[in-house]
Amino acid sequence: MNKDKLRNIAIIAHVDHGKTTLVDKLLQQSGTLDRKNMTTERIMDSNDQERERGITILAKNTAINWKDHRINIVDTPGHADFGGEVERVLSMVDSVLLLVDAVDGPMPQTRFVTQKAFEKGLNPIVVINKVDRPEARPHWVLDQVFDLFDNLGATDEQLDFTVIYASALNGFAGHEPDELADDMTPLLDMITKKVAAPDVDESAPFSCLLYTSDAADEVDRG
């Protein structure tokens, strides 16, 4: 695939702000994963502890084909106990989706990871999630996010961030909290528009950063 059609992003958020649910919906609505063929919820939580606790411990990756682009997504831990796993993948992406709860706003872990992203020169797309909750206060949360970025020493470019409002559970997103589309198209389109393509030298010798590996307990000897 043409590298100009690639988008590499990481999703960072505090625990329980809806990160894994958002990835589930993006996979389903893009056609990458058909709901009727799913055997389990929480697609990106692959081990038993993650499913039981409802959190992401190890960095996972998946890819979405959207229109003529391929979006590579790394779903990183949002729990403070696994913060090192978050930092590990930030050097492998070109932008981040900062997912923030529409009631709680930015949390301490959000601050830590966002600072690491800024230090690496990454520009965020802010997704304010759960705007369908009765107690949601998205405009207050947006102000809190801006103040956080400013306090972290964000550049003018990083402060000029794009905001998407969403209800990941229901699969809706939009540019205003009271004007959501019927699906996640606004978010997917914004990723392809705002996230830069990888900056690589295609004439250089092959090199890569490995961020996921796995092993099979059994192999086919037939």
Language model: regions and residue ranges:
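P-loop NTPase switch module centered on the Walker A-proximal segment
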Residues: M1-V100, D104-P106, V113-T114, Q144
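Conserved phosphate-binding elements of NTP-dependent enzyme cores
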Residues: L97, A117, S167
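Glycine/charge-rich, flexible interdomain linkers and switch-proximal surface loops
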Residues: E202-L210
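Short glycine-/polar-rich loops that comprise or flank the Walker A/P-loop
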Residues: V93-S95, K120-P124, L159-F161
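Conserved C-terminal guanine-recognition region of P-loop GTPase G domains, centered on the G4
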Residues: A102-T155
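Conserved small/polar residues in nucleotide/adenosyl-binding loops
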Residues: Y211-E218
